[in-house]
Curated annotation (Swiss-Prot):
The lineage of its organism: Eukaryota, Metazoa, Chordata, Craniata, Vertebrata. Plays a role in the formation and organization of tight junctions during the establishment of polarity in epithelial cells. The modification Phosphoserine is found at S39, S436, S517. It is found in: Cytoplasm; Cell junction, Adherens junction; Cell membrane; Photoreceptor inner segment. One of its GO terms (molecular function) is protein domain specific binding. The gene is EPB41L5. GO terms for cellular component: adherens junction; cytoskeleton; cytosol; focal adhesion; nucleoplasm; photoreceptor inner segment; plasma membrane; ruffle membrane. This is Band 4.1-like protein 5.
């Protein structure tokens, strides 16, 4: 009697305890669905949804799986429910899909409450066939979990794009004031998420501006469907050799993997038999041999547990029926009275064909997209490292510009400095004269030419039109074209000529000093292109190097030794006058460069005095008349041009304390005096710095002709004696 009461009271107490526990579980869940009705025996099922929320459902004790599934679909308001299923774990930790035809209590042994998970059961081969926006949203959530758990392998670039689509769908458009790269670290997209990937996701997110959440989710699915393992349901098996293999169920067939390598594919039409017994799965495949005859191949796989083997078999049957059949197989109502062999399981849901081909009215539904789980934000180290070089480069640029400006303004001083010129050289195209020997039109060169205009707009017109001429030989033209001079516009300061370039040029010109070759008559115009602006400048007869364009003089030449004695004496007188004039004698230039140079350049960039500039602009050349028939008339014209080319400074410069050596004039009786400008070009290069005391290099080709007598040598010597007290300056540029 006592045992009876103990048993009865004990059962009642157990029921009360179970009822209280059920109520606690229902209160813990976010949503509670009472679907048991008036049933006294109630079971509680707790379903975890894809968005992370939980739903608690009360059902009758003998309720089947389809009742629970319908309650969840009704709660979600989901129409395309055939792609989804409820999954649970058994005591052997084997995952199973809840069978809608069987009792929940018989399938799920662990409870109550019975815990299940809503998952995508069949991955659509074409996501665009999904009609409902809610269906696509749930697919995105499932794929996101597959990638995060490592079930679905994803390359780096694809993972970055998919993560950017997730951010666009959840956060909307990128906002510079609100979003920073550290924001990406609050989300988890892949198992191993590096800072490099987060920065790439952040940059990719900016490109998806303007996409709505629905558009971003559609793009996500269209990108994810091309993954190799998309929609593959993997099961680990063992073959006869004892090695581990993986069978992947896909819409097209069964894949066979050895590790990560795909070694085979069995198409559904080629599979004739698929059955199981205990933990062995038998697969019979028909293939054509070389002769075209069908041959059957039998494959046997083993699994660790019989329940896992049956689960694999059921999944294969469902995949074949869903993707290959037009409709589910109807179960026969006649049940055999004999002992049943094998399983009676058949797929009872709709196929993909029925789901996509059935005309359904599109409906406008509203649902709430729940935010993803957030994690603690971390500071990106790569961003700091990436911005430091940029800041450093910007700082360097600023310092370079400031230094360049200081150097540009510092060029006004007389101290010799050689900073790097910030502005690029302006290309000036100098066309070789067609009359120059050894040069053609294809020898045209575009050299960087820098013009110092000395902040005078009027000086440009006076200097460009002041010089004409051509090189005497190919070597001379090449040596002159190798001169690299820097360019500045008015008001920007005078650039400096590199010392090494001037030194090399001076040495080249000095080597060519002794070479004698005939010079042709100069051109009267030259094309000068400055700053890519084609401007044809016709040079006038006003120039520093006055050229007597006379047919008679072009034929008659002065011996080089005569001209050398006279000009050397003039040079010695110039060198000994003042230190300032000696600096001016350093100026390197040629006849071609003088067409564009506006002032004389020296190593220290000392500008010419204002008086000398005015004198340069007021100089008039000697009159070039007709052909001189008499030698005496020619000599008078030459001596007149010599005196006119001398620059007379109005202010007498300070004379150095050193004793002045009076030049010795040697005037032979059988020759004529010339300043080297009779029908040819004269190039004088002064190189006085750095131990070079040779004076001015002279290039004057021979012109063998004789003059009977010198008629005006006396007046010329007297005039030059008077000019000794003034600043003498030759016509060299």
């Amino acid at each position: 009697m006592l045992s009876f009461f103990r048993r009865t009271l004990g059962r009642r107490s157990m029921r009360k305890h179970a009822e209280k526990e059920r109520l606690r579980e229902a209160q813990r869940a976010a949503t509670h669905i009472p679907a048991a009705g008036d049933s006294k025996s109630i079971i509680t099922c707790r379903v975890s949804l894809l968005d992370g929320t939980d739903v608690s459902v009360d059902l009758p004790k003998k309720a089947k799986g389809q009742e629970l599934f319908d309650q969840i679909m009704y709660h979600l308001d989901l129409i395309e429910s055939d792609y989804f299923g409820l999954r649970f774990m058994d005591s052997a930790q084997v995952a199973h899909w809840l069978d809608g035809t069987k009792s929940i209590k018989k399938q799920v042994k662990i409870g109550s409450p019975y815990c299940l998970h809503l998952r995508v059961k069949f991955y659509s081969s074409e996501p665009n066939n999904l009609r409902e926006e809610l269906t696509r949203y749930l697919f995105v959530l499932q794929l996101k979990q597959d990638i995060l758990s490592g079930k679905l392998d994803c390359p780096f670039d694809t993972a970055v794009q998919l993560a950017a689509y997730n951010l666009q769908a959840e956060l909307g458009d990128y906002d510079l004031a609100e979003h920073s790269p550290e924001l990406v670290s609050e989300f988890r997209f892949v198992p191993i998420q590096t800072e490099e990937m987060e920065l790439a996701i952040f940059e990719k997110w900016k490109e998806y501006r303007g996409q709505t959440p629905a558009q971003a989710e559609t793009n996500y699915l269209n990108k994810a469907k091309w993954l190799e393992m998309y929609g593959v349901d993997m099961h680990v098996v063992k073959a006869r050799d004892g090695n581990d293999y993986s069978l992947g169920l896909t819409p097209t067939g069964v894949l066979v993997f050895e590790g990560d390598t795909k070694i085979g594919l069995f198409f559904w039409p080629k599979i004739t038999r698929l059955d199981f017994k205990k933990n062995k799965l038998t697969l019979v495949v028909v293939e054509d041999d070389d002769q075209g005859k069908e041959q059957e191949h039998t494959f046997v796989f083993r699994l660790d547990h019989p329940k896992a083997c049956k689960h694999l078999w059921k999944c294969a049957v469902e995949h074949h029926a869903f993707f290959r059949l037009r409709g589910p197989v109807q179960k026969s109502s006649h049940r055999s009275g004999f002992i049943r062999l094998g399983s009676r399981f058949r797929y009872s849901g709709k196929t993909e064909y029925q789901t996509t081909k059935t005309n359904k009215a599109r409906r406008s539904t509203s649902f709430e997209r729940r935010p993803s789980k957030r994690y603690s934000r971390r500071t990106l180290q790569m961003k700091a490292c990436a911005t430091k070089p940029e800041e450093l480069s910007v700082h360097n640029n600023v310092s370079t510009q400031s230094n360049g400006s200081q150097q540009a303004w510092g060029m006004r001083s007389a101290l010799p400095v050689s900073p790097s010129i910030s502005s690029a050289p302006v290309p000036v195209e100098i066309e070789n004269l067609p009359q120059s020997p050894g040069t053609d039109q294809h020898d045209r060169k575009c050299i960087p030419l820098n013009i110092d205009l000395l902040n005078s707009p009027d000086l440009l017109e006076a200097t460009i039109g002041d010089v004409i001429g051509a090189s005497d030989t190919m070597e001379t033209s090449q040596a002159l074209n190798d001169v690299n001079v820097a360019t500045r516009l008015p008001g920007l300061g005078e650039p400096e000529v590199e010392y090494e370039t001037l030194k090399d040029t001076s040495e080249k010109l000095k080597q060519l000093e002794m070479e004698n070759s005939p010079l042709l008559s100069p051109r009267s115009n030259i094309d000068v292109n400055i700053n890519s602006q084609e401007e044809v400048v016709k040079l006038t007869e006003k120039c520093l190097n006055n050229v007597i364009e006379s047919p008679g003089l072009n034929v008659m030449r002065v011996p080089p030794d005569f001209k050398s004695n006279i000009l050397k004496a003039q040079v010695e007188a110039v060198h000994k006058v003042t230190k300032e004039d000696s600096l001016l004698s350093h100026k390197n230039a040629n006849v071609q460069d003088a067409a564009t140079n506006s002032a004389v350049l020296n190593e220290n960039n000392v500008p010419l005095p204002k008086e000398s500039l005015e004198t340069l602009m007021l100089i008039t050349p000697a009159d070039s008349g007709s052909v001189l028939k008499e030698a005496t008339d020619e000599l008078d014209a030459l001596l007149a041009s010599l005196t006119e080319n001398l620059i007379d400074h109005t202010v007498a410069p300070q004379v150095s304390s050193t004793s002045m050596i009076t030049p010795r004039w040697i005037v032979p009786q059988s020759g004529a005096m010339s300043n080297g400008l009779a029908g040819c070009e004269m190039l004088l290069t002064g190189k006085e710095g750095h131990g070079n005391k040779d004076g001015i290099s002279l290039i004057s080709p021979p012109a063998p002709f004789l003059v009977d007598a010198v008629t005006s040598s006396g007046p010329i010597l007297a005039e030059e004696a008077v000019l000794k007290q003034k600043c003498l300056l030759t016509t060299e540029l």
